[in-house]
């Protein structure tokens, strides 16, 4: 199974948790707080004849929900759904791409401007990462893990008006 994840269905929603203790991260997410409110809304990238759109709901009930679609012309070529939540002191990024089974990634060491989620047993990608560039710009990437196996694929997103997408 070669699942390729894109974009901010890159739950970068955990990027701002870095300076917050794990116990505060749990309670913030569990009570519906938004530790990364900047991610809520819509992000997009366009190029190579395709459009990738990401939409994120603010945290409620202990989770943030995200979804993505990639279109080429009038055809949806890829889609995915993400659930972001704290399980104990671990931040989980649960993603379902197309008709593939759900894959769970766990945050390794989020900081104030970057988060990396990892699943060393998954075929590809093994890591999903995000870096906040500015309030309206986000870089996301996937790769084959710390060992450098497999390609590193990057995505540059800009914030867009959800109503106009």
Predicted features and spans:
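Bacterial N-terminal signal peptides
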Residues: 8-19
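Central antiparallel beta-sheet cores of small beta-barrel/beta-sandwich binding domains
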Residues: 26-30, 39-40, 45-121
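Sec/Tat signal peptide C-region and signal peptidase I cleavage site
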Residues: 20-24
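Short hydrophobic/aromatic beta-strand element in the GNAT-like acyltransferase core
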Residues: 53, 127, 154
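Positively charged n-region of N-terminal signal peptides that target proteins for export
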Residues: 1-6
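Edge beta-strand at a domain terminus
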Residues: 25-26, 102-107, 112, 137-139, ...
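Well-ordered alpha/beta subsegment
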Residues: 117-119, 123, 128-132, 140-143
């Amino acid at each position: 199974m070669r699942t390729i994840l894109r974009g901010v269905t890159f739950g970068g929603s955990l990027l701002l948790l870095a300076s917050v203790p794990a116990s505060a991260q749990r309670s913030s997410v569990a009570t519906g707080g938004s530790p990364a409110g900047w991610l809520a809304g819509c992000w997009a990238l366009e190029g190579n004849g395709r459009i990738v759109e990401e939409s994120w709901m603010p945290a409620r009930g202990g989770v943030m929900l995200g979804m993505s679609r990639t279109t080429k012309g009038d055809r949806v070529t890829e889609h995915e759904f993400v659930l972001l939540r704290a399980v104990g002191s671990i931040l989980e990024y649960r993603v379902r791409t197309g008709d593939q089974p759900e894959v769970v990634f766990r945050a390794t060491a989020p900081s104030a401007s970057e988060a990396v989620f990892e699943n060393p047993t998954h075929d590809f990608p093994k890591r999903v990462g995000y870096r906040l560039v500015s309030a309206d710009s986000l870089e996301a990437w996937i790769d084959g893990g710390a060992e450098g196996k497999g390609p590193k694929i990057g995505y540059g997103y800009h914030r867009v008006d959800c109503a106009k997408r």
